[in-house]
């Protein structure tokens, strides 16, 4: 399969949900097109990476465990408004949809038209789902519009300025008392072989990921933020972390 890098892709209005209320154009960021075109923005990327076994392999067999740890934070049944930031390869969204109660609704956003199209294709039941092209660092939702927000393996793919804005936006759109759930990379313990195995992998393929080894996710919260609680747990020898912020 041949991958040929293309230029920046602008918003494809035909892929946006008609009820999104999106009023401004969304453009794929330059950093994403330059750094991750092979994984997210190229049309052939989906054909390569949208394989459950592959995303599980990339996470060293931990995909299902980390997925379930994130979703358990939202409860067995979700009756509120939940936001998934970025489409995510694998069956993460399908499992989230299964938790939606009669009054639950899921908004899924992604900046890449290729990912929006893929999400439409892989979700068979979209009755309680809106799939919207939006920039995570400049969301077009009202303040305090969601009961919970989940950000699954996205922060490590962002330069620090975009990451900081995305964390602030996730906080902004969450209702007081609601949860923001982050799952991402973390610095492994010194005794873990992945402390050494992952360095060349991440520095080669994920140039922003080492930030998650060097700083806490809470480091990127906006100054003066008001949070009730911040909880952190690590997994698989410390290579992965779950951070739950209660707004």
For each predicted feature, which ranges?
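A short acidic, Gly/Pro-enriched loop at the edge of an enzyme's catalytic core
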Residues: 137-149
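A short glycine-rich, Lys/Arg-flanked "PGG" loop and its adjoining helix->strand segment in the class I
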Residues: 164-176
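Conserved alpha-helix/loop element of class I SAM-dependent methyltransferases that forms part
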Residues: 58-78, 95
């Amino acid at each position: 399969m041949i991958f040929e890098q293309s230029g920046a892709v602008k918003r494809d209005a035909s892929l946006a949900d008609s009820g999104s209320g999106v009023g401004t154009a969304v453009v794929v960021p330059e950093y994403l097109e330059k750094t991750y075109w092979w994984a997210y923005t190229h049309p052939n990327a989906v054909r390569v990476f949208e394989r459950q076994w592959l995303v599980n392999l990339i996470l060293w067999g931990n995909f299902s465990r980390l997925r379930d740890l994130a979703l358990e934070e939202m409860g067995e049944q979700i009756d509120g408004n939940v936001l998934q930031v970025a489409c995510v390869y694998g069956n993460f969204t399908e499992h989230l949809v299964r938790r939606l109660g009669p009054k639950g609704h899921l908004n899924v956003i992604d900046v890449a038209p290729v990912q929006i199209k893929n999400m439409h294709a892989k979700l068979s039941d979209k009755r309680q789902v809106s799939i919207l092209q939006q920039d995570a660092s400049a969301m077009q939702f009202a303040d305090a519009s969601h009961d919970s927000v989940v950000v699954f393996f996205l922060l490590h793919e962002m330069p620090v300025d975009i990451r900081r804005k995305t964390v602030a936006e996730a906080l902004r759109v969450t209702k007081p008392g609601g949860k923001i759930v982050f799952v991402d990379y973390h610095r492994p313990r010194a005794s873990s072989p992945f402390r050494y195995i992952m360095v060349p992998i991440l520095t080669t393929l994920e140039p922003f990921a080492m930030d998650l080894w060097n700083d806490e996710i809470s480091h990127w919260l906006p100054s003066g933020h008001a949070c009730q609680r911040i909880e952190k747990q690590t997994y698989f020898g410390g290579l992965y972390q779950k951070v739950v912020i209660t707004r």
